[in-house]
Regions:
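Compositionally biased, charged N-terminal/linker segments
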Residues: 1-43, 137-138
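A generic structural signal for short beta-strands and their flanking turns/coil linkers
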Residues: 2, 22, 43-45, 58-60, ...
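GIY-YIG nuclease signature motif recognition
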Residues: 6, 62-65, 125
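Short, charged, solvent-exposed linker or helix-capping segments at domain edges/interfaces
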Residues: 17, 96-102, 133-135
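Hydrophobic beta-strand signal
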Residues: 48-49, 63
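Short, charged beta-turn/beta-strand-edge "cap" motif at the junction between a beta-strand
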Residues: 50-56
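Aromatic- and Lys/Arg-enriched surface recognition patch
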Residues: 61-119
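Charged phosphate-binding loop/patch that engages nucleotide di/tri-phosphates or the phosphate backbone
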Residues: 120-138
Length: 138
């Protein structure tokens, strides 16, 4: 099993809404590196959801339930073969893991969230995902 981090603006699509929906297609990703990562996701992979912009915290966990397929939100004039995956919402973290805590923790010294902060989908190491679970109270 691999581990991933995806970003969402809570004003657009919060983890609480995701939990109400139970599942969602993770659409709208328009970054070439992120597209590569979406294509690498496998059914059953663990996905941490990060609220960007206002909250700046890892807030919940999800699972990949359908691997990459063509993103239905692509406009006809858009360049690129954009994809999405389907995710199933899991638990909200009892203690959201703030970006400041991630930046100050040596376990995250190489985490993509900090090194490539504009990337909306990124892999996590086993060590990083274990530390997120620990800090988040899971």
């Amino acid at each position: 099993m691999n581990h991933w981090l995806v970003k969402s603006e809570p004003e657009s699509y919060s983890f609480a809404q995701f939990q109400k929906d139970k599942t969602t297609a993770w659409t709208g990703v328009r970054s070439f590196p992120a597209r590569i990562f979406l294509r690498q996701m496998a059914k059953g992979d663990e996905v941490f959801v990060y609220h960007s912009v206002s909250e700046k915290a890892v807030v919940g966990v999800a699972t990949v339930i359908k691997t990459a397929y063509p993103d239905p939100t692509v406009e006809p004039d858009e360049k690129g073969e954009w994809v999405c995956v389907d995710l199933k919402a899991g638990k909200a973290l009892p203690k959201p893991v703030l970006l400041a805590a991630i930046k100050s923790n040596r376990a995250f010294k190489d985490i993509q969230l900090v090194r490539q902060s504009r990337l909306s989908v990124a892999p996590l190491t086993e060590k990083e995902s274990a530390e997120l679970r620990k800090l988040g109270g899971l």
